[in-house]
């Protein structure tokens, strides 16, 4: 019957009812203090408490594999995956991406999923969060695999790939043994690279560390993060990159009241107060960034209550039909002239809104070009 999925709120009861011997912590993007607080609770209740090895849990592929991970959610993994994909395409390699799991429905049906077209996304009833990760790959002409059974997923991907890209989620460690491991570090959140689990592991085991978004970060914070990278992983190559932010129709934003919609996880467990959409609105000369909180309904209102750091920015939550409906209602009720969409997808495909939408894109740019391509060539 598989492993039962139970609420962590009931952990003490489950331990005592079943006389549990061991508890393994196996989710990501939480402060170190959270993990140890949980450990102290568990060992006080009786069982051993453990965290999983990064390397012993990796599946080996028969094809060259490049893993892209991060120290926190919302650093720029997906844009880096696209950047590396384009390098491989230029080298004449057939690329297949495997995305970190985001299963919310029938897990048996989602064991091994393959996405090549938008119709595939519809057929698998993908959430907004899944679409945010899959659509950019499809737009670039790449097949994406995801699901639950990551042994069978990689074996299917190997049948059609010269090179496999692991597109990591949250700040989790790779599920596959990489030939090249790239980790993104965020100067907008200096110190988080040493204080979040398991992101610090990625920092310490990577071959290439990318300090991203240096074009929008304070110089002293960039230097702090660079120093932490070199101290934690002295054998890694460390480079700086820009995240180049572009609005497709900046004229819709200039002088207008803008409602900024950002990638949900970046604003929620990622802990950010802004994202690419906020920068795009500022760059385009928005007269005002409208606070959506007073107009939020249902699940969106609950998200603001749980994550007050989101501030005036609207997180694009869409894990189910009700959240999508609440997102649409919140956008339509907010008195703005334009929606600045900082998510990686086109919301117009998902919801119907009563305002024009300016879509924002963000792409990786090496400050000193050439290092990433050189390291990619070395493993393929």
Language-model segments: which ranges?
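Flexible phosphate-sensing "switch/lid" loops adjacent to ATP/NTP-binding sites
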Residues: 9-18, 66-69, 79, 86-365, ...
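Conserved glycine(s) of the Walker
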Residues: 75-76
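Repeat-unit-sized solenoid/scaffold elements
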Residues: 34-55, 168-169, 357-375
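Short, conserved acidic/polar surface loops in the N-terminal third of protein domains
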Residues: 34-38, 60-63, 108-109
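"Short basic amphipathic alpha-helical interaction patches in structured regions
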Residues: 37-39, 81-84
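Flexible, Lys/Arg-rich cytosolic regulatory linkers and terminal tails that connect or flank
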Residues: 46-70
């Amino acid at each position: 019957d598989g492993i039962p999925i139970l609420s962590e709120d009931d952990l003490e009861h489950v331990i005592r009812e079943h006389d549990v011997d061991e508890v393994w912590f196996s989710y990501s993007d939480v402060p170190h203090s959270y993990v140890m607080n949980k450990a102290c609770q568990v060992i006080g209740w009786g069982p051993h408490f453990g965290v999983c090895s990064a390397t012993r849990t990796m599946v080996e592929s028969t094809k060259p594999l490049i893993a892209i991970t991060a120290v926190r959610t919302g650093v720029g993994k997906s844009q880096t995956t696209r950047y590396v994909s384009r390098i491989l395409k230029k080298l004449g390699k057939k690329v297949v991406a495997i995305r970190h799991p985001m299963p919310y429905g029938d897990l048996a049906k989602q064991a091994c999923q393959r996405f090549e077209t938008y119709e595939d996304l519809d057929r698998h009833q993908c959430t907004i969060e899944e679409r945010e990760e899959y659509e950019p790959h499809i737009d670039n002409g790449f097949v994406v695999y995801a699901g639950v059974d990551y042994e069978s997923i990689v074996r299917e991907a190997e049948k059609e790939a010269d090179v496999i890209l692991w597109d990591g989620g949250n700040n989790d460690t790779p599920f596959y043994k990489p030939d090249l491991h790239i980790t993104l570090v965020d100067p907008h959140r200096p110190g988080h690279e040493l204080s979040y689990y398991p992101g610090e592991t990625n920092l310490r085991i990577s071959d290439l560390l990318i300090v991203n978004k240096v074009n929008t970060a304070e110089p002293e914070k960039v230097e702090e993060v660079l120093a932490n990278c070199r101290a934690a992983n002295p054998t890694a190559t460390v480079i700086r990159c820009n995240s180049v932010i572009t609005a497709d129709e900046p004229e819709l934003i200039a002088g207008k009241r803008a409602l900024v919609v950002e990638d949900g996880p970046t604003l929620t467990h990622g802990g950010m107060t802004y994202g690419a959409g906020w920068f795009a609105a500022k760059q385009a000369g928005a007269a005002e960034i409208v606070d959506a909180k007073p107009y939020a309904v249902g699940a969106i209102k609950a998200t603001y209550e749980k994550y007050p750091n989101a501030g005036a920015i609207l997180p694009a939550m869409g894990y189910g039909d009700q959240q999508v409906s609440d997102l649409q209602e919140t956008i339509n009720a907010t008195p703005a002239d334009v929606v600045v969409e900082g998510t990686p997808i086109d919301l117009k495909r998902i919801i119907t809104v009563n305002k024009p939408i300016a879509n924002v894109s963000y792409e990786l740019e090496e400050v000193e070009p050439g290092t990433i391509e050189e390291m990619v060539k070395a493993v393929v």
